[in-house]
């Protein structure tokens, strides 16, 4: 198969592993810089140009689209979809997952467990907002934050009021979320491929820190998950419409709670922690889909 990887940096671990794993399985794999693509919206014959050439003949595309280029990245991916190329994750699903508020609303509507969460911009009653999610301690997040940036734990009601007022001064949209103390500063990253959890790792925050992101010094280790955690992760990915996803869960006293569904999960942490060939499992999924008469691209670039 001829496969494209949309990535701005071919030397990143995830990108290089996906290229290596694909070539090892006999595929022709091209890494394409997302922002350097330019598109022709010609009637009935959409095309993509790259380095002066028309990109054609691709069977599948693996999007590795960074959060900062979501708009342009999903536009390029949508163009590939319109050309009949099978996407590992569809553009509409990536856009859905990148919108934190929309993600939470969809998960809520489908009854997927998650922390009690409030959303606000300029609340006229901050005390009521805090009470609405169960009071302090609570977590306050900037809606646009990634990798633990713009996330604050307010231990007291007074601290929560101060943080919310500060964020209001930035004219920012904020999420106010119950703090799951029993999680002990740890979360679980479930790696979902094609309706199956193929690997899971525990991410433990450093002492004195509550954010467990590996980018913030969190430590990863292999973990055995429960059947309920497994089904919750699969359901969350399905709600987003993602074939491949990193679903972050917290263990609470009332079952697994979804924190986030990542449409472009990194491979380094999970492969290192579990020793599993996740890149190879992704290609197994693509190969299986390619043998279907009509690969399940639900939106055909219409999203």
Swiss-Prot record:
InterPro entries associated with the record: ATP-grasp (IPR011761), ATP-grasp_RimK-type (IPR013651), ATP_grasp_subdomain_1 (IPR013815), RimK (IPR023533), Rimk_N (IPR041107), Rp_bS6_RimK/Lys_biosynth_LsyX (IPR004666)
Range of residues in the leader sequence: none
Flavoprotein recorded as keyword: no
Note describing how the cofactor binds: Binds 2 magnesium or manganese ions per subunit.
Binding-site residues for Mg(2+) 1, renumbered to this chain: 248, 260
Keyword Lipoprotein: no
Domain of life where this protein originates: Bacteria
Binding, ATP: 141, 178-179, 187, 211-213
All copies of domain ATP-grasp, residue ranges: 104-287
Binding site residues for Mn(2+) 2: 260, 262
GO BP, sorted A to Z: protein modification process; SOS response; translation
UniProt record similarity statement: Belongs to the RimK family.
Protein name: Probable alpha-L-glutamate ligase 1
Native species: Hahella chejuensis (strain KCTC 2396)
Organism placement in taxonomy: Bacteria, Pseudomonadati, Pseudomonadota, Gammaproteobacteria, Oceanospirillales
